């Protein structure tokens, strides 16, 4: 069975997930990963190639069409990347069987165009929370997890617990009240933050009354080593964040860190309040929950053991590999068809950007001048000089 994965790149969580899943695939599955841009980080691409997969960069959109014609299944690794939307809109695809694996939840911006879900033969989410989206056809959609834990067994809780956060250190994802919550703790504590901090996060940390509680350690390529230094994983994310599988949360739980999260959809599908961690309704509730954990070692030990066992039982590469193989084999019985993805996403770069913003999008009062993924600036960076995007920018 020949599977062609069309993806903007293999960086971050997408590449990490595929490297893990590919190692659990049966021998009769051959995977080709066709990248739409040259990779900047080759770690996961090299791991896939070393395991027997083919990894290549598309020369042209005609190259994408040619390789799609040779595959049994074409799987699009979906998120709001400009190059992927260009590929969907401008490639002259042959008849094919299409699967989309969405690495965004679609619950908040960036949204998933409903017509794209309808155009796909199968549309796969990475979180059960996405099944709440309106208008989904049950026969077309599925959920396959992309976040996996570490194999190492959990270690014992310390008498004096330490707190950690690992991930995006920016209010685009981290809740802006994170530092206020740490400041509000009655007891002193040590909090290690792993991830490159934004200017907003740095200002918030420096403005704390108890700034010495915070340690900013930057990015790490050894997350397991970073996490094993802590006992509690404080992971409050802003309510409309774009995350789905939450790899850092899953990894932390797998080695026994007790999570404290907000009741956002993605996190609430991973953490069970009072069983595998603690779930707060609001950021203001977090200091009390943290203090409860810090002062009750028996509770920490129970939740720690439950968290590790839950991840080991439910979130493994083998389970995801089996789920995909079953989905692909089921789709082989269906005759290939010529897709019209352009009708679902639009014809111009401005159409593609707006397709992920919803009907109520309006230009921001303060334009985002950074090329953060999926932003208007990102689209302009990729399609420099495009008239449709310039009109959108002028409106802001």
PLM feature spans:
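Conserved donor-binding/catalytic core segment of Leloir-type glycosyltransferases
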Residues: 4-6, 152-173, 179-186, 192
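Glycosyltransferase donor-sugar binding loop
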Residues: 33-41, 190-203
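Short hydrophobic beta-strand element within catalytic cores of glycosyltransferases
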Residues: 34-35, 257-262
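Nucleotide-activated donor-binding/catalytic signature segment of Leloir-type glycosyltransferases, i.e.
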Residues: 50, 202-220
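Donor nucleotide-sugar binding/catalytic pocket of nucleotide-sugar-dependent glycosyltransferases
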Residues: 119-153
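Nucleotide-sugar-dependent
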Residues: 236-250, 262-264, 268-269
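Conserved acidic donor-binding segment of nucleotide-sugar-dependent glycosyltransferases
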Residues: 273-274, 278-284, 292-297
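C-terminal amphipathic helix plus adjacent low-complexity
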Residues: 313, 318-396
């Amino acid at each position: 069975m020949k599977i062609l994965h069309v993806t903007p790149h293999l960086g971050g969580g997408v590449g990490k997930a595929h490297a893990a899943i590919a190692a659990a695939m049966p021998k009769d599955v051959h995977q080709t990963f066709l990248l739409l841009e040259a990779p900047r980080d080759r770690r996961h691409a090299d791991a896939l190639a070393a395991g027997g997969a083919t990894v290549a960069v598309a020369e042209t959109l005609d190259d994408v069409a040619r390789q799609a014609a040779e595959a049994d299944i074409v799987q699009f690794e979906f998120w709001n990347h400009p190059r992927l939307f260009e590929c969907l809109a401008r490639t002259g695809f042959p008849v094919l069987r299409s699967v989309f694996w969405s690495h965004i939840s679609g619950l908040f911006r960036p949204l998933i165009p409903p017509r794209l879900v309808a155009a796909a033969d199968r549309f796969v989410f990475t979180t059960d929370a996405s099944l709440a989206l309106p208008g989904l056809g049950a026969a077309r959609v599925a959920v396959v997890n992309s976040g996996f834990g570490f194999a190492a067994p959990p270690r014992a809780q310390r008498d004096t617990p330490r707190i950690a956060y690992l991930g995006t250190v920016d209010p685009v994802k981290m809740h802006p009240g994170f530092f206020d919550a740490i400041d509000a703790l009655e007891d002193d504590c040590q909090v290690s933050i792993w991830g490159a901090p934004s200017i907003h996060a740095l200002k918030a940390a420096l403005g704390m009354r108890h700034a010495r509680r915070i340690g900013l350690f930057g990015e790490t390529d050894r997350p397991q080593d970073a996490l094993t230094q802590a006992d509690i994983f404080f992971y409050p994310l802003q309510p409309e964040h774009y995350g789905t599988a939450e790899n850092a949360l899953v990894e932390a739980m797998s080695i026994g860190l007790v999570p404290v999260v907000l009741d956002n959809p993605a996190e609430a599908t991973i953490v069970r309040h009072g069983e595998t961690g603690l779930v707060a309704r609001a950021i203001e509730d977090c200091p009390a929950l943290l203090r409860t954990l810090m002062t009750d070692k028996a509770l920490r030990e129970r939740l720690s053991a439950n968290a590790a066992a839950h991840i080991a039982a439910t979130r493994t590469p083998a389970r995801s590999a089996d789920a995909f193989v079953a989905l692909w084999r089921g789709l082989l019985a269906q005759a290939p068809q010529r897709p019209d993805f352009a009708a679902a996403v639009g014809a111009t770069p401005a159409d593609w950007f707006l397709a992920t913003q919803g009907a109520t999008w309006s230009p921001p009062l303060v334009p985002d001048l950074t090329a953060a993924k999926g932003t208007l600036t990102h689209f302009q960076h990729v399609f420099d000089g495009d008239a449709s995007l310039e009109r959108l920018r002028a409106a802001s």
